[in-house]
Protein backbone atom coordinates (compact mmCIF):
# COMPACT_ATOMS: atom_id res chain seq x y z
CA UNK A 1 0.00 0.00 0.00
CA UNK A 2 1.38 3.43 -0.95
CA UNK A 3 -0.96 5.56 1.17
CA UNK A 4 -3.35 5.10 4.09
CA UNK A 5 -5.74 7.60 5.66
CA UNK A 6 -7.65 7.15 8.91
CA UNK A 7 -10.81 9.23 8.53
CA UNK A 8 -11.71 11.84 11.11
CA UNK A 9 -14.49 10.70 13.40
CA UNK A 10 -16.76 12.29 15.98
CA UNK A 11 -14.98 10.09 18.52
CA UNK A 12 -11.85 12.18 18.03
CA UNK A 13 -13.27 14.44 20.73
CA UNK A 14 -14.13 18.10 21.17
CA UNK A 15 -10.49 19.17 21.53
CA UNK A 16 -10.07 18.99 17.76
CA UNK A 17 -12.20 22.14 17.39
CA UNK A 18 -10.94 24.18 20.33
CA UNK A 19 -10.47 27.88 19.65
CA UNK A 20 -8.37 28.93 22.67
CA UNK A 21 -5.01 28.12 24.20
CA UNK A 22 -3.74 25.21 26.25
CA UNK A 23 -4.04 27.08 29.56
CA UNK A 24 -7.83 26.87 29.14
CA UNK A 25 -7.57 23.15 29.96
CA UNK A 26 -6.33 23.91 33.48
CA UNK A 27 -9.11 26.45 34.07
CA UNK A 28 -11.77 23.97 32.95
CA UNK A 29 -10.22 21.15 35.00
CA UNK A 30 -10.35 23.25 38.18
CA UNK A 31 -13.92 24.38 37.46
CA UNK A 32 -15.23 20.87 36.79
CA UNK A 33 -13.24 18.81 39.32
CA UNK A 34 -11.48 21.20 41.72
CA UNK A 35 -10.70 18.55 44.34
CA UNK A 36 -9.43 15.86 41.98
CA UNK A 37 -5.75 15.01 42.41
CA UNK A 38 -4.19 16.32 39.21
CA UNK A 39 -0.57 15.78 40.25
CA UNK A 40 1.44 13.90 42.83
CA UNK A 41 4.52 15.92 43.62
CA UNK A 42 7.76 14.09 44.34
CA UNK A 43 9.53 14.78 47.63
CA UNK A 44 12.73 12.87 48.51
CA UNK A 45 12.71 11.06 51.83
CA UNK A 46 15.03 8.96 53.94
CA UNK A 47 13.08 5.80 53.05
CA UNK A 48 12.67 6.66 49.36
CA UNK A 49 10.57 9.18 47.48
CA UNK A 50 7.29 10.40 48.91
CA UNK A 51 4.42 12.00 47.04
CA UNK A 52 2.17 14.91 48.00
CA UNK A 53 -1.16 15.48 46.26
CA UNK A 54 -1.86 18.61 44.22
CA UNK A 55 -5.52 19.17 43.33
CA UNK A 56 -6.71 20.76 40.11
CA UNK A 57 -7.77 23.89 42.01
CA UNK A 58 -4.40 24.22 43.74
CA UNK A 59 -2.55 23.74 40.47
CA UNK A 60 -4.59 26.47 38.76
CA UNK A 61 -3.91 28.86 41.65
CA UNK A 62 -0.16 28.20 41.37
CA UNK A 63 -0.24 28.61 37.58
CA UNK A 64 -1.95 31.98 37.95
CA UNK A 65 0.53 33.17 40.57
CA UNK A 66 3.52 32.37 38.36
CA UNK A 67 1.81 33.79 35.26
CA UNK A 68 1.25 37.06 37.14
CA UNK A 69 4.97 37.19 37.86
CA UNK A 70 5.81 36.73 34.19
CA UNK A 71 3.42 39.54 33.24
CA UNK A 72 4.88 41.81 35.93
CA UNK A 73 8.40 41.02 34.66
CA UNK A 74 7.47 42.42 31.27
CA UNK A 75 6.94 39.17 29.35
CA UNK A 76 4.57 40.09 26.52
CA UNK A 77 2.19 37.95 24.45
CA UNK A 78 4.22 35.92 21.96
CA UNK A 79 7.53 36.41 23.81
CA UNK A 80 9.70 33.32 24.13
CA UNK A 81 10.61 32.00 27.59
CA UNK A 82 13.23 29.22 27.87
CA UNK A 83 12.88 26.34 30.35
CA UNK A 84 15.94 24.28 31.26
CA UNK A 85 15.48 21.63 33.91
CA UNK A 86 15.22 17.95 34.60
CA UNK A 87 11.76 16.38 34.76
CA UNK A 88 9.89 17.80 37.75
CA UNK A 89 6.53 19.22 38.80
CA UNK A 90 7.71 22.83 38.41
CA UNK A 91 8.34 22.34 34.70
CA UNK A 92 4.68 21.57 34.09
CA UNK A 93 3.69 24.46 36.37
CA UNK A 94 5.89 26.88 34.42
CA UNK A 95 4.76 25.54 31.05
CA UNK A 96 1.13 26.31 31.82
CA UNK A 97 2.02 29.65 33.45
CA UNK A 98 3.85 30.71 30.29
CA UNK A 99 0.78 29.85 28.20
CA UNK A 100 -1.54 31.58 30.69
CA UNK A 101 0.55 34.74 30.22
CA UNK A 102 0.20 34.41 26.44
CA UNK A 103 3.88 33.62 25.92
CA UNK A 104 5.72 30.81 24.11
CA UNK A 105 7.72 28.07 25.87
CA UNK A 106 11.15 27.09 24.56
CA UNK A 107 12.27 23.83 26.21
CA UNK A 108 16.00 23.14 26.56
CA UNK A 109 17.53 19.85 27.68
CA UNK A 110 19.35 20.15 31.00
CA UNK A 111 22.30 18.38 29.35
CA UNK A 112 22.59 20.85 26.45
CA UNK A 113 26.22 21.96 25.94
CA UNK A 114 27.03 25.66 25.88
CA UNK A 115 27.27 25.95 22.09
CA UNK A 116 23.84 24.36 21.57
CA UNK A 117 22.35 26.41 24.39
CA UNK A 118 23.71 29.61 22.85
CA UNK A 119 22.18 28.68 19.50
CA UNK A 120 18.73 27.99 20.97
CA UNK A 121 18.61 31.12 23.14
CA UNK A 122 19.81 33.38 20.33
CA UNK A 123 17.77 31.77 17.57
CA UNK A 124 14.54 31.87 19.60
CA UNK A 125 15.32 35.38 20.92
CA UNK A 126 14.18 34.30 24.39
CA UNK A 127 13.41 37.25 26.69
CA UNK A 128 13.63 35.19 29.88
CA UNK A 129 14.88 31.83 31.09
CA UNK A 130 14.07 29.57 34.03
CA UNK A 131 16.69 26.98 34.96
CA UNK A 132 16.77 24.29 37.62
CA UNK A 133 20.08 24.90 39.38
CA UNK A 134 22.75 27.59 39.83
CA UNK A 135 25.08 25.44 37.71
CA UNK A 136 22.64 25.63 34.80
CA UNK A 137 22.33 29.37 35.41
CA UNK A 138 26.10 29.64 35.07
CA UNK A 139 25.91 27.71 31.80
CA UNK A 140 23.28 30.13 30.49
CA UNK A 141 25.52 33.08 31.38
CA UNK A 142 28.50 31.35 29.74
CA UNK A 143 26.44 31.12 26.55
CA UNK A 144 26.40 34.92 26.39
CA UNK A 145 23.08 35.63 28.12
CA UNK A 146 22.70 39.42 28.67
CA UNK A 147 22.04 39.20 32.41
CA UNK A 148 21.13 42.83 32.97
CA UNK A 149 18.76 42.98 30.01
CA UNK A 150 16.90 39.67 30.26
CA UNK A 151 15.50 37.73 33.21
CA UNK A 152 17.11 34.56 34.54
CA UNK A 153 15.35 32.70 37.35
CA UNK A 154 16.66 29.62 39.18
CA UNK A 155 14.28 27.03 40.64
CA UNK A 156 16.68 25.80 43.32
CA UNK A 157 18.41 29.09 44.07
CA UNK A 158 20.76 28.78 47.04
CA UNK A 159 21.18 32.57 47.34
CA UNK A 160 17.55 33.64 47.40
CA UNK A 161 13.96 32.62 46.77
CA UNK A 162 13.52 30.05 44.03
CA UNK A 163 12.00 30.95 40.68
CA UNK A 164 8.43 30.03 41.65
CA UNK A 165 8.52 32.05 44.89
CA UNK A 166 10.24 34.99 43.20
CA UNK A 167 7.69 35.13 40.37
CA UNK A 168 4.81 34.75 42.81
CA UNK A 169 6.06 37.73 44.83
CA UNK A 170 6.75 39.78 41.71
CA UNK A 171 3.21 39.31 40.41
CA UNK A 172 1.22 40.28 43.49
CA UNK A 173 0.09 43.59 41.96
CA UNK A 174 -1.16 42.07 38.68
CA UNK A 175 -4.96 41.93 38.92
CA UNK A 176 -7.19 39.05 37.82
CA UNK A 177 -8.74 40.96 34.93
CA UNK A 178 -5.38 41.72 33.35
CA UNK A 179 -4.27 38.12 33.74
CA UNK A 180 -7.48 36.73 32.26
CA UNK A 181 -7.16 39.03 29.25
CA UNK A 182 -3.78 37.44 28.58
CA UNK A 183 -5.21 33.91 28.70
CA UNK A 184 -8.40 34.55 26.73
CA UNK A 185 -6.58 36.48 24.00
CA UNK A 186 -4.65 33.35 23.01
CA UNK A 187 -6.05 31.70 19.88
CA UNK A 188 -5.62 28.09 18.83
CA UNK A 189 -3.51 29.07 15.83
CA UNK A 190 -1.04 31.04 17.98
CA UNK A 191 2.39 29.56 18.66
CA UNK A 192 2.49 27.46 21.83
CA UNK A 193 6.10 26.31 21.80
CA UNK A 194 9.27 26.15 19.75
CA UNK A 195 10.93 22.78 20.28
CA UNK A 196 14.43 22.39 18.93
CA UNK A 197 15.21 19.04 17.36
CA UNK A 198 17.96 16.89 18.83
CA UNK A 199 20.40 17.82 16.11
CA UNK A 200 22.01 14.43 15.48
CA UNK A 201 23.83 15.74 12.41
CA UNK A 202 23.57 19.56 12.36
CA UNK A 203 22.35 22.64 14.22
CA UNK A 204 18.99 21.97 15.87
CA UNK A 205 15.99 23.43 14.08
CA UNK A 206 13.12 25.05 15.96
CA UNK A 207 9.80 23.31 15.27
CA UNK A 208 6.96 25.82 15.60
CA UNK A 209 3.96 24.10 17.18
CA UNK A 210 0.67 25.87 17.77
CA UNK A 211 -1.97 25.37 20.44
CA UNK A 212 -4.12 23.86 17.67
CA UNK A 213 -1.43 21.30 16.82
CA UNK A 214 -1.65 19.99 20.38
CA UNK A 215 -5.45 20.25 20.65
CA UNK A 216 -6.08 18.34 17.43
CA UNK A 217 -3.33 15.78 17.76
CA UNK A 218 -4.26 15.01 21.35
CA UNK A 219 -7.97 14.91 20.58
CA UNK A 220 -7.36 11.98 18.24
CA UNK A 221 -4.77 10.29 20.47
CA UNK A 222 -6.87 10.39 23.64
CA UNK A 223 -9.92 9.08 21.81
CA UNK A 224 -7.96 6.15 20.35
CA UNK A 225 -6.22 5.27 23.63
CA UNK A 226 -9.30 5.72 25.81
CA UNK A 227 -8.72 2.33 27.46
CA UNK A 228 -5.63 3.71 29.20
CA UNK A 229 -7.69 6.40 30.93
CA UNK A 230 -10.75 4.30 31.73
CA UNK A 231 -9.79 3.70 35.36
CA UNK A 232 -11.11 6.29 37.81
CA UNK A 233 -7.66 6.36 39.44
CA UNK A 234 -5.66 6.37 36.18
CA UNK A 235 -2.16 7.71 36.72
CA UNK A 236 1.17 7.86 34.95
CA UNK A 237 4.73 8.72 35.92
CA UNK A 238 6.72 10.99 33.62
CA UNK A 239 10.14 9.48 32.93
CA UNK A 240 11.04 11.43 29.79
CA UNK A 241 13.01 14.69 29.66
CA UNK A 242 10.43 17.48 29.53
CA UNK A 243 12.20 19.08 26.57
CA UNK A 244 11.09 16.09 24.46
CA UNK A 245 7.88 16.61 22.48
CA UNK A 246 6.59 13.24 23.67
CA UNK A 247 6.86 14.43 27.29
CA UNK A 248 5.02 17.67 26.55
CA UNK A 249 2.21 15.68 24.92
CA UNK A 250 2.05 13.35 27.93
CA UNK A 251 1.70 16.27 30.34
CA UNK A 252 -0.98 17.93 28.21
CA UNK A 253 -2.80 14.65 27.70
CA UNK A 254 -2.81 13.97 31.44
CA UNK A 255 -4.53 17.30 32.11
CA UNK A 256 -7.03 16.84 29.27
CA UNK A 257 -7.87 13.25 30.27
CA UNK A 258 -7.91 13.92 34.05
CA UNK A 259 -5.04 11.49 34.67
CA UNK A 260 -2.93 11.96 37.80
CA UNK A 261 0.63 12.83 36.75
CA UNK A 262 3.91 12.45 38.60
CA UNK A 263 7.46 13.36 37.58
CA UNK A 264 10.73 11.51 38.14
CA UNK A 265 13.98 13.39 37.44
CA UNK A 266 16.39 10.54 36.80
CA UNK A 267 15.98 7.14 35.18
CA UNK A 268 18.29 5.77 37.89
CA UNK A 269 15.64 6.51 40.52
CA UNK A 270 12.85 5.07 38.38
CA UNK A 271 12.53 1.67 40.13
CA UNK A 272 12.09 3.33 43.54
CA UNK A 273 9.67 5.90 42.10
CA UNK A 274 7.59 3.23 40.37
CA UNK A 275 7.31 1.27 43.61
CA UNK A 276 5.85 4.24 45.50
CA UNK A 277 3.89 6.02 42.75
CA UNK A 278 2.35 2.84 41.27
CA UNK A 279 1.17 4.14 37.86
CA UNK A 280 -1.60 2.45 35.87
CA UNK A 281 0.27 3.05 32.60
CA UNK A 282 3.69 4.28 31.49
CA UNK A 283 4.97 6.21 28.51
CA UNK A 284 8.60 6.40 27.44
CA UNK A 285 11.30 5.59 24.92
CA UNK A 286 12.41 1.96 24.37
CA UNK A 287 15.72 2.44 26.18
CA UNK A 288 13.86 3.10 29.45
CA UNK A 289 12.04 -0.21 29.19
CA UNK A 290 15.20 -2.06 28.13
CA UNK A 291 16.89 -0.80 31.30
CA UNK A 292 13.99 -1.93 33.46
CA UNK A 293 14.23 -5.45 32.02
CA UNK A 294 18.02 -5.46 32.45
CA UNK A 295 17.61 -4.37 36.07
CA UNK A 296 15.16 -7.22 36.68
CA UNK A 297 17.56 -9.66 35.02
CA UNK A 298 20.50 -8.48 37.13
CA UNK A 299 18.43 -8.69 40.31
CA UNK A 300 17.43 -12.25 39.46
CA UNK A 301 21.06 -13.19 38.75
CA UNK A 302 22.19 -11.72 42.09
CA UNK A 303 19.60 -13.94 43.82
CA UNK A 304 20.81 -17.06 42.03
CA UNK A 305 17.73 -17.09 39.76
CA UNK A 306 19.40 -15.94 36.54
CA UNK A 307 18.71 -19.12 34.56
CA UNK A 308 15.08 -19.12 35.67
CA UNK A 309 14.71 -15.50 34.58
CA UNK A 310 16.24 -16.26 31.16
CA UNK A 311 13.93 -19.24 30.69
CA UNK A 312 10.92 -17.16 31.71
CA UNK A 313 11.96 -14.45 29.25
CA UNK A 314 11.99 -16.93 26.37
CA UNK A 315 8.61 -18.28 27.50
CA UNK A 316 7.11 -14.78 27.52
CA UNK A 317 8.40 -14.09 24.01
CA UNK A 318 7.15 -17.43 22.65
CA UNK A 319 3.77 -16.88 24.32
CA UNK A 320 3.35 -13.52 22.59
CA UNK A 321 4.47 -14.93 19.25
CA UNK A 322 1.96 -17.78 19.67
CA UNK A 323 -0.79 -15.21 20.26
CA UNK A 324 0.09 -13.69 16.88
CA UNK A 325 -0.26 -17.11 15.27
CA UNK A 326 -3.58 -17.64 17.04
CA UNK A 327 -2.53 -20.89 18.66
CA UNK A 328 -1.04 -21.49 22.14
CA UNK A 329 -0.16 -25.13 22.81
CA UNK A 330 -0.82 -26.84 26.18
CA UNK A 331 2.89 -27.20 27.04
CA UNK A 332 3.58 -23.51 26.40
CA UNK A 333 0.44 -22.56 28.32
CA UNK A 334 1.55 -24.56 31.37
CA UNK A 335 5.09 -23.19 31.20
CA UNK A 336 3.77 -19.63 30.89
CA UNK A 337 1.50 -20.09 33.92
CA UNK A 338 4.44 -21.36 35.99
CA UNK A 339 6.83 -18.60 34.89
CA UNK A 340 4.14 -15.98 35.39
CA UNK A 341 3.83 -16.98 39.04
CA UNK A 342 7.58 -17.35 39.67
CA UNK A 343 9.04 -14.51 37.58
CA UNK A 344 6.66 -12.31 35.57
CA UNK A 345 4.65 -11.28 38.64
CA UNK A 346 7.88 -9.92 40.15
CA UNK A 347 8.65 -7.91 37.02
CA UNK A 348 5.14 -6.44 37.06
CA UNK A 349 5.76 -5.49 40.68
CA UNK A 350 8.90 -3.61 39.56
CA UNK A 351 6.56 -1.51 37.39
CA UNK A 352 4.58 -0.62 40.49
CA UNK A 353 2.15 -3.53 40.47
CA UNK A 354 -0.73 -1.69 38.74
CA UNK A 355 0.69 -0.95 35.28
CA UNK A 356 -1.64 -2.30 32.57
CA UNK A 357 -0.07 -0.78 29.46
CA UNK A 358 3.12 0.86 28.26
CA UNK A 359 3.22 3.34 25.37
CA UNK A 360 6.55 3.58 23.55
CA UNK A 361 7.75 6.17 21.07
CA UNK A 362 10.70 8.36 20.16
CA UNK A 363 12.82 5.48 18.81
CA UNK A 364 12.24 2.03 17.30
CA UNK A 365 11.09 -0.71 19.66
CA UNK A 366 12.78 -4.08 19.19
CA UNK A 367 10.35 -6.90 18.44
CA UNK A 368 11.79 -9.08 21.22
CA UNK A 369 11.11 -6.33 23.75
CA UNK A 370 7.58 -5.90 22.43
CA UNK A 371 6.87 -9.62 22.64
CA UNK A 372 8.46 -9.85 26.10
CA UNK A 373 6.24 -7.16 27.62
CA UNK A 374 3.08 -8.59 26.09
CA UNK A 375 4.17 -12.02 27.31
CA UNK A 376 4.41 -10.82 30.92
CA UNK A 377 0.98 -9.19 30.71
CA UNK A 378 1.91 -5.53 30.12
CA UNK A 379 1.54 -4.87 26.37
CA UNK A 380 3.68 -2.13 24.82
CA UNK A 381 1.69 0.04 22.44
CA UNK A 382 4.31 1.35 20.03
CA UNK A 383 3.62 4.57 18.19
CA UNK A 384 5.43 6.80 15.75
CA UNK A 385 5.84 10.52 15.47
CA UNK A 386 8.29 13.38 15.29
CA UNK A 387 8.78 16.75 16.92
CA UNK A 388 7.51 18.12 13.60
CA UNK A 389 4.23 16.19 14.02
CA UNK A 390 3.57 17.13 17.67
CA UNK A 391 4.48 13.55 18.57
CA UNK A 392 1.98 10.84 17.56
CA UNK A 393 1.10 10.12 13.94
CA UNK A 394 0.40 6.40 14.31
CA UNK A 395 -0.11 4.12 17.30
CA UNK A 396 -0.93 0.51 18.13
CA UNK A 397 -4.12 0.07 20.14
CA UNK A 398 -4.89 -2.51 22.84
CA UNK A 399 -7.35 -4.38 20.62
CA UNK A 400 -5.36 -4.01 17.38
CA UNK A 401 -1.77 -4.57 18.46
CA UNK A 402 0.69 -5.66 15.79
CA UNK A 403 4.21 -5.99 17.19
CA UNK A 404 6.91 -4.91 14.75
CA UNK A 405 4.77 -2.06 13.45
CA UNK A 406 4.02 1.41 14.83
CA UNK A 407 0.28 0.94 14.35
CA UNK A 408 -2.16 2.69 12.05
CA UNK A 409 -2.52 6.45 11.46
CA UNK A 410 -4.57 8.38 13.99
CA UNK A 411 -8.00 9.68 12.87
CA UNK A 412 -7.62 12.56 10.44
CA UNK A 413 -4.04 11.56 9.59
CA UNK A 414 -2.59 10.27 6.31
CA UNK A 415 0.70 8.45 5.76
CA UNK A 416 2.18 7.95 2.30
CA UNK A 417 5.24 6.06 1.05
CA UNK A 418 7.13 8.11 -1.54
CA UNK A 419 8.82 6.52 -4.54
CA UNK A 420 12.15 6.42 -2.69
CA UNK A 421 10.55 4.79 0.37
CA UNK A 422 10.36 7.92 2.52
CA UNK A 423 7.33 8.24 4.78
CA UNK A 424 5.26 11.38 4.22
CA UNK A 425 2.66 12.62 6.71
CA UNK A 426 -0.37 14.88 6.41
CA UNK A 427 -2.58 15.96 9.32
CA UNK A 428 -3.60 18.75 11.68
CA UNK A 429 -0.75 17.89 14.06
CA UNK A 430 1.98 18.79 11.53
CA UNK A 431 4.06 21.82 12.54
CA UNK A 432 3.62 25.23 10.98
CA UNK A 433 7.29 25.76 10.07
CA UNK A 434 10.86 25.75 11.29
CA UNK A 435 11.51 28.94 13.23
CA UNK A 436 13.26 31.54 11.05
CA UNK A 437 14.48 28.87 8.61
CA UNK A 438 12.77 29.14 5.23
CA UNK A 439 15.18 26.75 3.50
CA UNK A 440 14.62 23.87 5.94
CA UNK A 441 10.88 24.58 6.00
CA UNK A 442 10.69 24.35 2.21
CA UNK A 443 12.60 21.06 2.26
CA UNK A 444 10.31 19.51 4.88
CA UNK A 445 7.07 21.12 3.67
CA UNK A 446 7.49 21.78 -0.06
CA UNK A 447 3.91 23.01 -0.51
CA UNK A 448 2.05 19.83 -1.46
CA UNK A 449 0.59 19.32 2.02
CA UNK A 450 2.92 16.44 2.93
CA UNK A 451 5.67 16.55 5.57
CA UNK A 452 8.90 14.82 4.58
CA UNK A 453 9.77 12.79 7.69
CA UNK A 454 13.24 11.59 6.72
CA UNK A 455 12.17 8.09 7.78
CA UNK A 456 11.91 5.10 5.46
CA UNK A 457 9.09 2.60 5.82
CA UNK A 458 6.17 0.67 4.40
CA UNK A 459 2.42 0.26 4.91
CA UNK A 460 0.61 -3.08 4.85
CA UNK A 461 -2.84 -3.78 3.41
CA UNK A 462 -4.56 -2.99 6.72
CA UNK A 463 -2.80 0.34 7.20
CA UNK A 464 -0.19 -0.74 9.74
CA UNK A 465 3.01 1.26 9.28
CA UNK A 466 6.48 -0.23 9.65
CA UNK A 467 9.46 2.13 10.00
CA UNK A 468 12.60 0.52 8.61
CA UNK A 469 15.14 3.30 9.17
CA UNK A 470 16.23 6.85 8.51
CA UNK A 471 17.14 7.98 5.02
CA UNK A 472 20.40 9.31 6.44
CA UNK A 473 21.07 5.94 8.10
CA UNK A 474 20.92 3.97 4.86
CA UNK A 475 24.45 2.77 4.10
CA UNK A 476 25.53 1.82 0.60
CA UNK A 477 28.44 -0.63 0.42
CA UNK A 478 30.89 -0.67 -2.48
CA UNK A 479 28.91 -3.57 -3.95
CA UNK A 480 25.88 -1.26 -4.15
CA UNK A 481 23.91 -2.95 -1.36
CA UNK A 482 21.60 -0.67 0.65
CA UNK A 483 21.75 -1.43 4.39
CA UNK A 484 19.37 -0.06 7.05
CA UNK A 485 21.87 0.63 9.84
CA UNK A 486 19.27 1.55 12.45
CA UNK A 487 17.43 -1.75 12.18
CA UNK A 488 20.63 -3.76 12.62
CA UNK A 489 21.73 -1.63 15.58
CA UNK A 490 18.37 -2.09 17.26
CA UNK A 491 18.65 -5.88 17.05
CA UNK A 492 22.20 -5.96 18.38
CA UNK A 493 21.04 -3.83 21.33
CA UNK A 494 18.48 -6.51 22.20
CA UNK A 495 21.29 -8.38 23.99
CA UNK A 496 21.31 -7.50 27.72
CA UNK A 497 25.09 -6.92 27.72
CA UNK A 498 24.98 -4.42 24.85
CA UNK A 499 24.38 -0.75 25.54
CA UNK A 500 24.96 0.90 22.16
CA UNK A 501 25.88 -0.14 18.64
CA UNK A 502 26.98 1.85 15.60
CA UNK A 503 26.84 0.07 12.25
CA UNK A 504 29.30 1.30 9.62
CA UNK A 505 29.94 0.39 6.00
CA UNK A 506 29.01 3.33 3.78
CA UNK A 507 31.36 3.17 0.81
CA UNK A 508 33.09 0.13 2.32
CA UNK A 509 33.30 -3.47 1.10
CA UNK A 510 31.23 -4.91 3.97
CA UNK A 511 29.22 -3.98 7.06
CA UNK A 512 30.87 -3.73 10.49
CA UNK A 513 29.97 -2.41 13.93
CA UNK A 514 31.28 -0.64 17.02
CA UNK A 515 29.71 -1.96 20.23
CA UNK A 516 29.64 -0.57 23.78
CA UNK A 517 28.50 -2.51 26.84
CA UNK A 518 26.02 -1.71 29.59
CA UNK A 519 28.28 -0.97 32.61
CA UNK A 520 25.99 -2.57 35.20
CA UNK A 521 25.25 -5.64 33.09
CA UNK A 522 28.95 -6.09 32.33
CA UNK A 523 29.90 -5.74 36.00
CA UNK A 524 27.54 -8.57 36.94
CA UNK A 525 28.67 -10.71 34.01
CA UNK A 526 32.36 -10.20 34.83
CA UNK A 527 31.86 -10.91 38.54
CA UNK A 528 30.15 -14.21 37.75
CA UNK A 529 33.23 -15.24 35.75
CA UNK A 530 35.84 -13.99 38.18
CA UNK A 531 37.15 -11.30 35.83
CA UNK A 532 38.82 -8.41 37.64
CA UNK A 533 39.97 -5.03 36.45
CA UNK A 534 38.43 -2.53 34.03
CA UNK A 535 36.53 -3.46 30.89
CA UNK A 536 39.43 -2.18 28.80
CA UNK A 537 41.46 -5.17 30.00
CA UNK A 538 38.87 -7.66 28.76
CA UNK A 539 37.43 -6.36 25.46
CA UNK A 540 39.19 -9.19 23.61
CA UNK A 541 38.20 -11.83 26.18
CA UNK A 542 36.97 -14.87 24.25
CA UNK A 543 33.84 -15.35 26.38
CA UNK A 544 32.91 -11.67 26.05
CA UNK A 545 33.36 -11.66 22.30
CA UNK A 546 31.22 -14.80 22.13
CA UNK A 547 28.40 -12.93 23.90
CA UNK A 548 28.62 -10.01 21.49
CA UNK A 549 28.94 -12.41 18.56
CA UNK A 550 25.65 -13.97 19.66
CA UNK A 551 24.03 -10.53 19.55
CA UNK A 552 25.49 -9.91 16.09
CA UNK A 553 24.38 -13.34 14.86
CA UNK A 554 20.83 -12.67 16.03
CA UNK A 555 20.83 -9.39 14.10
CA UNK A 556 22.38 -10.99 11.02
CA UNK A 557 19.68 -13.67 10.98
CA UNK A 558 17.16 -10.98 9.99
CA UNK A 559 19.02 -9.72 6.90
CA UNK A 560 20.71 -11.04 3.78
CA UNK A 561 24.36 -12.08 3.79
CA UNK A 562 25.35 -8.88 1.98
CA UNK A 563 23.74 -6.79 4.76
CA UNK A 564 25.17 -8.82 7.64
CA UNK A 565 27.71 -7.45 10.13
CA UNK A 566 30.98 -9.15 9.28
CA UNK A 567 33.30 -7.68 11.92
CA UNK A 568 32.86 -5.78 15.18
CA UNK A 569 34.94 -4.13 17.88
CA UNK A 570 33.97 -3.96 21.55
CA UNK A 571 34.86 -0.53 22.93
CA UNK A 572 35.79 0.06 26.58
CA UNK A 573 33.84 3.34 26.67
CA UNK A 574 30.28 4.29 27.60
CA UNK A 575 28.41 6.62 25.24
CA UNK A 576 26.13 9.16 26.88
CA UNK A 577 24.57 12.60 26.62
CA UNK A 578 27.30 13.99 28.87
CA UNK A 579 30.13 12.71 26.68
CA UNK A 580 28.33 13.82 23.53
CA UNK A 581 27.73 10.58 21.62
CA UNK A 582 23.99 10.52 22.39
CA UNK A 583 21.27 13.11 22.12
CA UNK A 584 19.07 13.86 25.12
CA UNK A 585 16.51 11.44 23.64
CA UNK A 586 19.27 8.76 23.60
CA UNK A 587 19.76 8.69 19.83
CA UNK A 588 23.22 8.25 18.37
CA UNK A 589 25.05 11.35 17.18
CA UNK A 590 26.56 9.49 14.26
CA UNK A 591 28.84 12.26 13.11
CA UNK A 592 30.33 12.59 16.62
CA UNK A 593 30.94 8.84 16.96
CA UNK A 594 32.43 8.59 13.47
CA UNK A 595 34.79 11.47 14.22
CA UNK A 596 35.89 10.23 17.65
CA UNK A 597 36.30 6.60 16.65
CA UNK A 598 37.79 7.04 13.19
CA UNK A 599 40.77 4.81 14.06
CA UNK A 600 38.54 2.06 15.45
CA UNK A 601 36.47 2.09 12.25
CA UNK A 602 39.61 1.83 10.15
CA UNK A 603 40.74 -1.21 12.17
CA UNK A 604 37.53 -2.97 11.17
CA UNK A 605 38.69 -2.80 7.54
CA UNK A 606 42.39 -3.61 8.01
Residue ranges and their predicted role:
Residues 34-37, 172-196, 203, 229-235:
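Conserved pre-ATP/AMP-binding loop-to-beta segment of ANL
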Residues 35-96, 113-118, 168-171, 211-212:
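Conserved AMP-binding/adenylate-forming core of the ANL superfamily
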Residues 43-48, 52, 137-188, 296-344:
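ANL superfamily adenylate-forming
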Residues 53-57, 192-218:
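Conserved AMP-binding A3 loop
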Residues 72-73, 100-170, 547:
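Structural core segment of the AMP-binding/adenylate-forming
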Residues 79, 110-142, 217-237, 267-281, ...:
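Conserved ATP-dependent adenylate/AMP-binding module captured primarily in the ANL superfamily
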Residues 215-235, 242-344, 354:
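Conserved AMP-binding/adenylation subdomain of ANL enzymes
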Residues 409-477, 494:
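Conserved ATP-binding/catalytic segment of the ANL
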Amino acid sequence: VREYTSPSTAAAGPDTDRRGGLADDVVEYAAEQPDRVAFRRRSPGADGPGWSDVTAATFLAEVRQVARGLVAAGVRPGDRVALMSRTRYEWTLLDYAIWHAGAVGVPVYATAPVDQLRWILEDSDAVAAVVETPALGARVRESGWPDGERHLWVLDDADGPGAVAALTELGREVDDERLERRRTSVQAEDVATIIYTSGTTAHPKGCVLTHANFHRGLGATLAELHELFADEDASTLMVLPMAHVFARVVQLGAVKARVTLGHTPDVRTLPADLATFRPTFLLGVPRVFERLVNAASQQAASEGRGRLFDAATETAIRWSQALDRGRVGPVLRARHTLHDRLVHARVRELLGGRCRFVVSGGAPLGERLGHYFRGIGVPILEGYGLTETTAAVTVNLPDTLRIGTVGRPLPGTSVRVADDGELLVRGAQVMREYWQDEVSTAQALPGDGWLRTGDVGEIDDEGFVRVTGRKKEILVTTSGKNVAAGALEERVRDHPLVDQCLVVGDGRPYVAALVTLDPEAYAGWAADRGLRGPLSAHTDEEALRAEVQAAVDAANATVSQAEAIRRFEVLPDTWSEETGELTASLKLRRNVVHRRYRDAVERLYD
